[in-house]
Amino acid sequence: MKLWKPTLISVLSALTLFNAHAEPKQLDSVAVIVNSGVILQSDVDSALKTIKANAKQNKQPLPQETVLREQVLEKLIIDTLQQQEADRIGVKIDDNRLNEAIKEIAKNNQQTQEQLIASVAQEGLTYPEFREQVRKEMAASDARNALVRRRINILPAEVDTLAELLAQETDATVQYKISHIQLRVDDGQDKSTAETLANKLVNDLRNGADFAQMAYAYSKGPKALQGGDWGWMRKEEMPTIFADQIKMQNKGSIIGPFRSGVGFHILKIDDVKGLETVAVTEVNARHILIKPTIILSDEGAQKQLNEFVQRIKNGEVTFAELAQQYSQDPGSAAQKGELGYQTPDLYVPEFKHQIETLPVGQISEPFKTVHGWHIVEVLDRREVDRTDSALKNKAYRILFNRKFNEEASAWLQELRASAFVEVLKDEKDEQ
């Protein structure tokens, strides 16, 4: 069963694969210690069972048991580390946002709420378990997005240069469906060994070998458990090392091997199409930000904002006056809380959800992001089509997406390298 829409795969990829409690366990044990947390043997067994069942249903080959287990353990470790980061920085997913995400899942699977619940039960989950797992994965994704955003610096000159190039292009933009194999070269490892293997894999692939099977067996990349499938992307959405290699190759082309800082890469172009949408919705909103401190608790910040909303509704004070006096976002406070016309994608998920769903002129309930507690009011929405502003927004998104993918990969590697991880010997491995 496919629960997730394509655009949610990157946000919730581990959910159906690695979270299932279909059967009560009489005995359980710790499989991996990850910092102060643990991964249970039942989690590993459930993940392996689900992957094998899905592979059997889809008639997909799998690598040897030891290789598959290693990949599953590594994915569970990475997921756990991201969830720990979400807890550390205090990311919370409220019920309203969770409900919207679940509605979106049902919609994209062409299911009613009842049909989704039935499908979840077939996967071995109760509906409350499913909800909490979605909440957990959304929190981990939000933490990753927020922490990686802080590492990204985009200069105005970069945006202007790319916007000028985009203005010279035609409206149609080619999209590629690509698959990827990454052979990692660790410190002290002989690079020639990895290069020899990479050349052999390319030769085998060009002679008809199955790419997904090769990815399962050899890839150390982020999509190894999906057979290396990265899905549909425009070149500007790809990591730079991919985009630099793809010119105008045809469907079925094998590209590589080519080097990066982490090892050797092989790409396959599974399909090509040339469609692009250019309409952009921009939102002008204003907000008030209150940051919790040692003295001011979350509850205190929320209460203060609720009082602000009530005072505005009573006509005692204006939103602009309160923003100037109290908002702890210096940039917008000087503008009476106004953020100007921006595309919603530029904001963190909770803020984006509010400005996308609020009616114009309505003030939100207080809500929390990684920056603190907010209230927001949407002042206006407008559609922008091929203006200078739209081109610059598009250029910014392109640069952001490229740098985000690169920085996210580096962040995960740093997170993994700095973590205390101990994989405990499984009794099954000793038999």
UniProtKB/Swiss-Prot annotation:
It comes from the Bacteria. It is found in: Periplasm. It holds the Pfam family SurA_N. The keyword Cell inner membrane does not apply. Its main location: periplasm. It catalyses: [protein]-peptidylproline (omega=180) = [protein]-peptidylproline (omega=0). GO terms for biological process: chaperone-mediated protein folding; Gram-negative-bacterium-type cell outer membrane assembly; protein stabilization. Transmembrane segments: none annotated. InterPro entries: OMP_Chaperone_SurA, PPIase_dom_sf, PPIase_PpiC, PPIase_SurA, SurA_N, Trigger_fact/SurA_dom_sf. One of its GO terms (molecular function) is peptide binding. Keywords: Chaperone, Isomerase, Periplasm, Repeat, Rotamase, Signal. Residues 1-22 form the signal peptide. Gene3D superfamilies: 3.10.50.40, Porin chaperone SurA, peptide-binding domain. Chaperone involved in the correct folding and assembly of outer membrane proteins. Recognizes specific patterns of aromatic residues and the orientation of their side chains, which are found more frequently in integral outer membrane proteins. May act in both early periplasmic and late outer membrane-associated steps of protein maturation. This is Chaperone SurA. It comes from Vibrio cholerae serotype O1 (strain ATCC 39315 / El Tor Inaba N16961).
